[in-house]
Amino acid sequence: MNRFRVSKFRHTEARPPRRESWISDIRAGTAPSCRNHIKSSCSLIAFNSDRPGVLGIVPLQGQGEDKRRVAHLGCHSDLVTDLDFSPFDDFLLATGSADRTVKLWRLPGPGQALPSAPGVVLGPEDLPVEVLQFHPTSDGILVSAAGTTVKVWDAAKQQPLTELAAHGDLVQSAVWSRDGALVGTACKDKQLRIFDPRTKPRASQSTQAHENSRDSRLAWMGTWEHLVSTGFNQMREREVKLWDTRFFSSALASLTLDTSLGCLVPLLDPDSGLLVLAGKGERQLYCYEVVPQQPALSPVTQCVLESVLRGAALVPRQALAVMSCEVLRVLQLSDTAIVPIGYHVPRKAVEFHEDLFPDTAGCVPATDPHSWWAGDNQQVQKVSLNPACRPHPSFTSCLVPPAEPLPDTAQPAVMETPVGDADASEGFSSPPSSLTSPSTPSSLGPSLSSTSGIGTSPSLRSLQSLLGPSSKFRHAQGTVLHRDSHITNLKGLNLTTPGESDGFCANKLRVAVPLLSSGGQVAVLELRKPGRLPDTALPTLQNGAAVTDLAWDPFDPHRLAVAGEDARIRLWRVPAEGLEEVLTTPETVLTGHTEKICSLRFHPLAANVLASSSYDLTVRIWDLQAGADRLKLQGHQDQIFSLAWSPDGQQLATVCKDGRVRVYRPRSGPEPLQEGPGPKGGRGARIVWVCDGRCLLVSGFDSQSERQLLLYEAEALAGGPLAVLGLDVAPSTLLPSYDPDTGLVLLTGKGDTRVFLYELLPESPFFLECNSFTSPDPHKGLVLLPKTECDVREVELMRCLRLRQSSLEPVAFRLPRVRKEFFQDDVFPDTAVIWEPVLSAEAWLQGANGQPWLLSLQPPDMSPVSQAPREAPARRAPSSAQYLEEKSDQQKKEELLNAMVAKLGNREDPLPQDSFEGVDEDEWD
């Protein structure tokens, strides 16, 4: 063979399309795994959305000028780590997740409803599923990797055929050879292994692949002898290696690229030998031709991307535009779009070029799982890509049979988002579905429900049966109020307050914000005096020690409690007219803790009662009038992340770094009354009582650093959470702000740009998602204001303060209503008077209980909408079509002629030429 042969792909060029051809306005998610995050069949594209456990589904080909619509499929209760389409059935999708299961889904055709439940569930595994792939020759076999374990599954029986020998560390890649006989794995222990799963579970061959243990990936060539690996060398440089399984001790060829941190995703077309390398977080694609005969990795072309790459996938060869010499098509997943990038070989003649498009594997499996396991090595019959030889035989897998169509009168439509028509207005974003389905942890049983991605249907009853309940607050919109109400020119803010603190606090009169200057200074801003602050220094409270948390007394708007790193709590009295000078002497200093204080919480009903948690692992209950701690709670084994009083003030709940949630009755004893499992992650957590004190909501992290919500029954903590809802992956703890009147909770973290909004229910489905609020720049915190600050005339459900880098702005959450002239009593029940105490500290400590007064928010000049007179339905005039249907063709013709004659009329007006003046007779000469 000529060593210096000329490649037929040497002139291959990448052709990014125009923006009109993009699948735009999607919301792709970022995941910590090094998988593709997008896959394609000949009909559909599936990709990770920005909601954990939810995939976006979109057609591969558009229909004329109609925009492609994205449907959302709720697959798992946790992050989807990997996905794969069947090589034989375009509508059979497998998904693996951090919830430790593998699920198989039958996706519908255009205009049909997405499934509400998987057809097959494999697992659960002991660890999150990291890798999965369908078998290339047999329908119903797939390989999956979870932790150090690799299993080969018979999906029809929902049982593993074999479990390969344990690896030395986390398995990063597991792929089938093209003939389906071997499995290759790449592991974090730097070893590349080859298995023959039908012969023995141990590796038949192994070698050191890459010198660095960072992410490594594998891809087989068209034959079983050769495969390609990507990874990092000892110098942290990215490299690609070509291997021959017959000479496995060293690589045939290697290629070193650069020192970028993004892992390389190898997209290898085994028929052409073209390899596209996609680096996550980068803006460039590299294309090489893999030539095992030389051996060599020959560069072909490079493509500069317009946006950052989050994932990539190859389109199957049967879907390529072969008449335009498209030899590859890469789907680039970015944050907001899917960009199809075609690789074309320039040719003069517009015809089918057999040298570029050899026969490829068809879509009919060669064997069944039982025969394959018994040793059958039949290969999939090849088909020609020549359009003149099509269509080819099709195949529908029996693993998940297609669903029977519903009757026309109740057939649902897919919950779709028109791509390119998304609302671009700033302020809020609509959820893919009004129902967010949480999961029950695996120790408690199967998932309670699944987000179906189903949307509107002709019948409201069928909609409710398909979607389940939806929140009446789902259309609430967050809006930043006019700039006249902002406080601007804030300088020197302390943005590094401990994670246990909200960062600032507010009541209806003023805001307290810690400053970065030494001495633990706290600025007090008057909400009644908005505008630009002076450039000069503000009068402050000189705390004397760095501030760890602060809280306003709910019954005295002029008293502020400030906790310091010196284990002391200082109570400050702010003058009624505001802070006009620097205060250095607090009203009271509370001492008792031996370590730095974490959190402060005032009692909701009793005056002068304050709870504090500390790094000394205790919670102390203070009598502020006496200036001493009266109760001390124990039992924590690690740092206390958060504490919260129950609405009736009788119980206190805590969440701790030791992974436990505890409930105390402080007046009954120092030990916890109940104890249950909390979030697994140790990065931070928050706890709040919800649903009239029947439930506890905990926000925290799982073991994969994903932010999640856990809902507990307050009387049964030991049984674990009722439901768990995963949100996203971010470093900051979600801070919950709960409105007991509506059952709505606002959730956001320091440094976030999005505020989640959910309605909480004490029974399934527990979480109902509403519109979230988004902003172009991150905020430093969010604090909910009292209910009396809401403008009920504008149906304002909640008002909060948003702290930015240099300003403080109010945000109102309003519900669109048509008849605003009436008081919306269905969303504004009587609210508790939380600014007046019910008990004294001494009475509460002696065992007394009470209930807060209730106050109506209805203005005196408004009547409730429940008593509004019903509007009579407008009478619709019969359409002309109804009259025409009752007339014969002859009558229609006569009426048409009469109408034309009547329009023209019998006009006797003089003609234009009658008004012309002629010439004299003698002028004719």
UniProtKB/Swiss-Prot annotation:
Residues bearing the modification Phosphoserine: 462, 465, 915
Any one GO BP annotation for this protein: positive regulation of hippo signaling
Location in or out of the cell: Golgi apparatus membrane; Golgi apparatus, trans-Golgi network; Cytoplasmic vesicle; Cytoplasm, Cytosol
Compositionally biased intervals (Low complexity): 429-460, 866-882
Entry GO terms, CC: cytoplasmic vesicle; cytosol; Golgi apparatus; Golgi membrane; membrane; trans-Golgi network
Residue ranges with Basic and acidic residues bias: 884-896
UniProt entry keywords in alphabetical sequence: Actin-binding, Cytoplasm, Cytoplasmic vesicle, Golgi apparatus, Isopeptide bond, Membrane, Phosphoprotein, Protein transport, Repeat, Transport, Ubl conjugation, WD repeat
GO molecular function: actin binding
Tissue specificity remark: Widely expressed. Expressed in the spleen, peripheral leukocytes, testes, brain, thymus and small intestine.
Region (Disordered): 419-461, 858-925
Positions of WD repeats: 75-115, 124-163, 166-205, 209-253, 542-582, 592-632, 635-674, 728-768
Signal peptide: none
Record cross-link Glycyl lysine isopeptide (Lys-Gly) (interchain with G-Cter in ubiquitin), residues: 472, 680
Subunit structure, interactors included: Interacts with clathrin adapter AP1 complex. This interaction takes place at Golgi membranes and not AP1-positive endosomal membranes. Interacts (when ubiquitinated at Lys-472) with EPS15.
PANTHER family attached to this UniProt entry: CORONIN, CORONIN-7
Record family assignment: Belongs to the WD repeat coronin family.
Function summary: F-actin regulator involved in anterograde Golgi to endosome transport: upon ubiquitination via 'Lys-33'-linked ubiquitin chains by the BCR(KLHL20) E3 ubiquitin ligase complex, interacts with EPS15 and localizes to the trans-Golgi network, where it promotes actin polymerization, thereby facilitating post-Golgi trafficking. May play a role in the maintenance of the Golgi apparatus morphology.
The protein, known as: Coronin-7
Gene that encodes the chain: CORO7
